Amino acid sequence: MPQRLTRTMLALGATAALTLTGCSAAGPAETLENGDEKDVTIAVFNGWDEGIAASELWKAVLEEQGYDVELEYADPAPVYQGLSDDDYDVTLDTWLPITHADYIEQYGDDLVDLGAWNEDAKLTIAVNEDAPVDTLEELAANADAFDNRLVGIEPGSGLNRVTSDEVIPTYGLDDMDYLTSSTPAMLAELTAATGAGENIAVTLWRPHWAYDAFPLKDLEDPQGALGDAEGIHSFGGKSFEETHPTLAGWLKDFQMDSDLLYSLENAMFNENDSDDYGPVVEQWIDENREWVDSLTS
């Protein structure tokens, strides 16, 4: 766990000064036999592990097919701006109809929705399993048991928007200190609190490997402030279907259930002590070869 958190924080630091780069170099782009441009840039949201896992998986799969793949990390706003400008080719972690709806409303005319590859996504407020509350209503009445703290993630995330605009006012959590910084910082606090047997409340989401790593429970949301289950969509830039017609078709057909996703996330983030995800993903691919081969068949 410490290695995972350190790795992620280093990655975030390295990408904080990211400058968007165009996908097209000078001169004609190199093309594969299947009609796709050889170069692919996948934009990945900072801190969202299901997107990191899916992106690393597709990077490995596409490199087997002869593509040159770059993963570029950024927060959602620059990702969608970059997609709309064709600075990125595709991103694999758009949650709809709630979490990233504002971005799609702003940039959607210049994007291509390639469909949902997982339909089980859910925003949550999670607490340690033995916490003295079971609902968000009870959290408001027992905030002192959590030192009046609710630990969030990146300020620019859709989860932060839903928490600030919907959850906090709906359940009267305004007197709690709502702390936003980053997903790694939230996970570090979660690690420390559960290790010390202390109460903690965090913003989280399913699917996420933390549910296997920590003794957690989701607080019930009787008012539906966090919304219903969402789909995790792939979105391409406005030229993506022209520059990568074969890959666009593969992504439209892409489906990954939560059990498979948990398996990949656990291998990458829970069981992995390496700074390099590549070998871990390659091993996971070998263990799931029949399914992986179906992605490009």
Specify the residue positions occupied by each region the protein language model found.
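Short, well-ordered beta-strand elements
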Residues: 35-50, 67-72, 147-151, 251
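A conserved helix-loop-strand patch within extracytoplasmic ligand-binding domains
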Residues: 109-156
